[in-house]
Regions:
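Catalytic histidine neighborhood in serine/cysteine hydrolases
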Residues: 164-181
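Short beta-strand/loop motif that positions the catalytic acidic residue
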Residues: 140, 146-148
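Conserved alpha/beta-hydrolase "acid-adjacent" motif
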Residues: 153-159
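Catalytic histidine-centered segment of alpha/beta-hydrolase-like enzymes
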Residues: 7, 178-190
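Active-site loop/oxyanion-hole signature of alpha/beta-hydrolase fold enzymes
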Residues: 1-34
């Protein structure tokens, strides 16, 4: 994703990211995908892709479609303070260790955050603070599983319900005692189990 690696490309928004991905696949003549997945910010991007290209993939797995729905000055403060806090957390020795049960996951998260520039982090915080799934009547054909942890249910509820209404066949999964993004980042084997069930059975 733009802004997440050692390059000069900033993350702008999930909408912009979705357009880049769709364009890349069109340019390379790839139009028959089995699966699209996204967690956290990636969930926003995956949702945008499905809304723009309703036949983009046969299956979709979306985790932690979260937003706080902040507006105006509150959103600006959230972006400004959040930018500084997340950088501080990533640079403080031991602070994020074990956040996702796996040390490699914490190390990878810290490395990624420390490599982000100010503009990318600001845009990510704004996206996280006010992202809202677009209302539309066009149906999405990908058989979809939307997951979230019970500890983030309140923040995920609105976007999940809006997107669910736009999908022909959709399963909602609430994972007990899980936090934001904990499935994909901290428990990859369990994440893979959900993927296998979605593809092999069509639902769980």
């Amino acid at each position: 994703m733009s802004g997440h690696e050692l390059n000069d490309v900033d993350f702008i928004s999930s909408t912009h990211e979705a357009e880049l991905i769709i364009t890349w696949f069109q340019k390379h003549g790839i139009n028959d995908l089995l699966l699209i997945c996204g967690a956290s910010l990636g969930a926003h991007v995956a949702a945008e892709i499905l809304q723009k290209q309703r036949t983009f993939a046969q299956y979709a797995m979306i985790e932690s479609l979260k937003a706080y729905q902040y507006k105006g000055i509150i959103l600006k403060l959230f972006s400004y303070i959040g930018n500084k806090v997340i950088k501080k957390c990533a640079s403080t020795k031991g602070y994020m260790d074990g956040t996702y049960n796996q040390k490699y996951a914490s190390d990878d998260a810290k490395c990624t955050i420390n490599n982000m520039n100010k503009k990318t982090l600001e845009n990510i915080m704004i996206e996280s603070g006010n992202y809202q799934i677009k209302q539309q009547k066009t149906k999405i054909f990908a058989e979809t599983m939307i997951l979230y942890g019970s500890k983030e249910k309140k923040e995920c509820k609105s976007n999940t319900e809006i997107l669910q209404k736009q999908i022909e066949k959709c399963t909602i999964v609430e994972i007990p005692k899980y936090r934001h993004g904990e499935l994909a980042i901290g428990n990859p084997y369990k994440h893979l189990e959900y993927l296998k069930k979605l593809i092999s059975q069509g639902s769980i």
